[in-house]
Amino acid sequence: MSKVLITSALPYINGVPHLGHMVGCLLPSDVYARYMRMMGNEVLYVCGTDEHGTASEVGALKEGMPVEEYCDKYHARHAQTYRDFNLSFDYFGRTSSEQNKEITYHIFSQLDKNGYIAEKTMKQIYSVDDKMFLADRFITGTCPHCGYEKARGDQCENCTKVLEPTDLINARSTISGSTNLEVRETKHLFLNLPKIETKLVEWL
């Protein structure tokens, strides 16, 4: 008997879950979890709603409610839908939970202490009118690859190309529609993969 940890891609909190969520990321891991249990293995199958990022913020803006309330509302809907489909999660949580925050901070602290976190400078779009940086879904514009006029700053849903906010043509704020935008440099923290690569490959 083996101990098996299984998870699936965490569904974004925005909106009601649909068959794409099921088929794309949840059913394959659920089938695998059931199979591993049938084979006599000790299985821990975990999942949860991804409540971080612009998806939840844009969704909350559209519904005119605080982000926390929006996440509470849709987490409950996700959880109920997955119960209705009889998915066999051992634990279905939330990225906003205190437990997840503590675990994430602990892992980050250990990586930082051991020199695996690197600081780098990036260029980001800043909205002068909104007084904020516009990450992925906070910015919309024309896709440079296919000309789709409602491409987001993370991906074009028309041609599926992955994008950076700075790639967009005629970019505008999703929040206000403002085109009064600037490119500014900001500092970010990254996992230093080249430094950890050898140990990671050996572990895998």
Feature locations, PLM:
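N-terminal, positively charged nucleic-acid-binding surface of large information/translation enzymes
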Residues: M1-W203
